[in-house]
Amino acid sequence: MSRIEGVLGGQLLHEQVRWGLREFAVYCRIELGELVEMIEMGVLEPLGAEPEQWSFAARDLQRVRTARRLARDLGINLAGIAVILDLLEERERMSVRLRAAAGAFD
């Protein structure tokens, strides 16, 4: 698997790149308050115990983008969005495992 997590805005994002709280908010074009609310509701789980220590990875960018689309397009609240995002990630993990298991029988 490539070490590239994704492509956003024409930039390749390495999976080991980390952003602090303010830097991440600016990069996502999101207000700090909205970002903190996403964290409080479980949409995002940054590394670090305190806001000053929080850091975010490339996968968090995709979660923010998806969360904002779900809220805007479908009117889903943040608690619901957190559940949906977790289920989507679980589905992806299961899909990877299924493909690996199917490949073992080829």
What spans do the regions from the language model cover?
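Arg/Lys-rich, alpha-helical DNA-contact motif
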Residues: 2-27, 32-36, 40-106
